């Protein structure tokens, strides 16, 4: 059966929907109409395609990681090189699409939330390109962890709001951005950074990120003359993974692995393993798996990587998990640091800490699958933003002599 989600109410099975105050309902409905129109608009599609090619640098390579494969001692590992995009991660695919859509809707301001700062940088970049006013909401903790990205956003002309509510991380930045959107919905578009939020956001972000899997599928067929046995990608909100997975959803022979952040371990309170440890609940306008206590209070997510410590997961991922289309696994901070070092030393590629979770799991999976099998790993971003943090962490552990 051909996959056909979401339904016309924006649900993926039981997950998804539009759980927003009346004040935002008009805005999400307006966005729905504008997005559907843009899909049929050849001028819009041509402009987006041209920007992805000439500005972002797509298509990026599908690279056979020979030495990483040898290190793992099993399945052939291919890397989809989203780290080579302009701004250094997959986030630009979605930011460009949404800012172009905002322009088409006649909005002159954009706002966005950011965790690691990559989506903030991508949105500020797209806003600069189109001459739009841009405000980014970022948790105070993340502002400290990612000061370089804060400077980048300001350099690109964006205002960065440090959010001091709650645990001062990504979920609090989303809350602040949604509140701000309610107040200025007439002239402002909210650029959602992941496959989260009320419909149509999860679908819009998925569709703009699907370029990852569309390219990877064609590139893999060209190189191997068959489809891969497995796909591996890290999952916070889940946009790079959904971008890789979605174009393969009807290829039943292809297994999909979403790698969540286990932080200090899933049996401690310090992790972000939403599928493993969460249960369905409503957060940020959508019904999805959420980390919550027995009273339904949202728990704090934790990860070494600022881009993965979100207490929810995109509703389509919750659906994939519920119907068994994808498997969700987890990798600890320690394992991710090991992945960070392994890829750097075997391939000369320094990955983002988010992507390092996928690398660490891919090495384990490659051993299990054996040398006859093949896989694609989404290398969602480069590690420049994380080098100082990793340096401090490893020096504290006396690993670097």
Swiss-Prot record:
Q: What is this protein called?
A: Tryptophan synthase beta chain
- In the Enzyme Commission scheme, what number(s) does this protein have? 4.2.1.20
Q: Which organism is it from?
A: Lactococcus lactis subsp. cremoris (strain SK11)
Chemical reaction(s) catalysed: (1S,2R)-1-C-(indol-3-yl)glycerol 3-phosphate + L-serine = D-glyceraldehyde 3-phosphate + L-tryptophan + H2O
GO terms under cellular component: cytoplasm
Keyword Lyase on entry: yes
Q: Which GO terms describe its molecular function?
A: tryptophan synthase activity
Gene that encodes it: trpB
Q: How does it assemble?
A: Tetramer of two alpha and two beta chains.
Cofactor names from the entry are:
pyridoxal 5'-phosphate
Sites of N6-(pyridoxal phosphate)lysine modification: 91
* Keyword Transport appears in the UniProt entry: no
